[in-house]
């Protein structure tokens, strides 16, 4: 009976160790995924900012060109 109890305790202990290792690996994977998501969000924000700046510059250039044409037509 004592042998059976020791075996059962050993199996339970090994199961807990295995579960602990699996949970740790899962947490590490979740942390890596969060970092990747953060990096992707940062890249998107950077890209949107760049596109916004380009659109502003294009709008200013178009406005300047139209203003120049209007001024030439008035002369």
UniProtKB/Swiss-Prot annotation:
Location comes to: Secreted
Q: In which tissues is it expressed?
A: Expressed by the skin glands.
- Could you tell me where the Acidic residues compositional bias lies? 30-40
Look up the signal peptide feature and give its range: 1-22
UniProt keyword annotations, A-Z? Amidation, Amphibian defense peptide, Antibiotic, Antimicrobial, Cleavage on pair of basic residues, Secreted, Signal
Residues that make up the propeptide removed upon maturation: 23-43, 74-75
**Disordered: where is this region?**
24-44
List the GO biological process terms: defense response to bacterium
- UniProt xrefs under Pfam families: DD_K, FSAP_sig_propep
Identify the GO cellular component terms for this protein: extracellular region
Entries under InterPro entries matching the protein:
Dermaseptin_dom, Frog_antimicrobial_propeptide, FSAP
Q: Which residues carry this modification: Glutamine amide?
A: 72
Which branch of life, at top level? Eukaryota
Q: Its biological function?
A: Has antibacterial activity against Gram-positive bacterium M.luteus NCT C2665 but not against Gram-negative bacterium E.coli K12D31.
| Similarity field | Belongs to the frog skin active peptide (FSAP) family. Dermaseptin subfamily.
Name-wise, this protein is Dermaseptin-related peptide
């Amino acid at each position: 009976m004592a042998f059976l109890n020791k075996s059962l305790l050993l199996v339970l202990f090994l199961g807990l160790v295995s579960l602990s290792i699996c949970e740790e690996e899962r947490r590490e994977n979740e942390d890596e995924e969060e970092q990747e998501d953060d990096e992707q969000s940062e890249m998107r924000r950077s890209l949107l900012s760049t596109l916004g700046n380009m659109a502003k510059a294009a709008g200013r250039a178009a406005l300047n060109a139209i203003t120049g044409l209007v001024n030439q037509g008035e002369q």
